[in-house]
Design a protein with these regions (language model features):
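Domain-level signal for Mg2+-assisted phosphodiester chemistry and nucleotide/NA-binding surfaces
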Residues: 1-93
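Extended two-metal-dependent nuclease catalytic cores across DNA- and RNA-processing enzymes
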Residues: 27-28, 52-54, 78-218
């Protein structure tokens, strides 16, 4: 099994600790952050090794630039004022040095992971690659995902049909975390009903196109 780790969220969360006093910043020092990151990664790999024989681990983190922001100025604009952990860049550098993490330019980390997943599954087969991430966007791929979130710690085995549905559902629902919502008021219930007879990409595209045409009257 080839394990692809999207480490962005893990690096971010490794910067934080529980506040011990009201004056506490809530951030780890760099050495504690490294230890936390290493500990969680080892736990993830050990968990996967219970079910699969791990042949290779590839880490992805710290993408620079994003073509989506050139298309839409509102993309992730809701995160502009978010405080960035002061040791974030240093921890990213550590992961790059210690784990030889792959870094995307002009794209996001999940774009790079998806590209690697596609190429590797073409070569070794879909059941020989697993993505490690808490990001729901990967459910748009017919892949095996390990969600390491402490409340979940579970596998998702996404079928072709599920991946297709998830892809077109997100075209309508958008993603509030990324400040993407072009069809306000249309959620899961709408998609479930609108897509109930859809099988092909053409079926889905007709539904999505009709809705956008209705909303934007173009």
């Amino acid at each position: 099994m080839i394990v692809l780790i999207d480490a962005d969220s893990l690096i971010w969360s490794s910067c934080y600790k529980q506040k011990e006093t009201p004056e506490d910043s809530g951030y780890h020092n760099i050495e504690d952050a490294k230890d936390k990151y290493n500990e969680v990664v080892m736990k993830i790999i050990n968990t996967i090794e219970v079910d699969y024989e791990v042949d290779k681990v590839i880490t992805f983190a710290g993408a620079r630039g994003n073509f989506r922001k050139q298309i839409s100025k509102t993309y992730k604009a809701n995160r502009i004022d978010r405080e960035v952990p002061p040791i974030l860049n240093e921890l990213q550098d550590y992961v790059k040095e210690q784990y030889q993490s792959k870094q995307g330019y002009g794209i996001e980390t999940d774009d790079l992971v998806a590209t690697y997943w596609t190429n590797l599954t073409d070569t070794f087969g879909r059941d020989e690659v697993i993505i490690v991430s808490i990001d729901k966007d990967y459910k748009q791929l017919p892949c095996i995902i390990y969600d390491y979130h402490y409340k979940k710690q579970c596998y998702h085995n996404i079928t072709e049909a599920e991946a297709k549905y998830n892809f077109y559902e997100q075209m309508i629902m958008g993603d509030t975390a990324d400040n993407v919502n072009f069809c306000k008021g249309y959620g899961k219930a709408y998609c479930k009903n609108a897509f109930k007879d859809c099988l092909s990409d053409y079926n889905y595209i007709r539904v999505v196109f009709s809705l956008f045409k209705k909303i934007y009257k173009q």
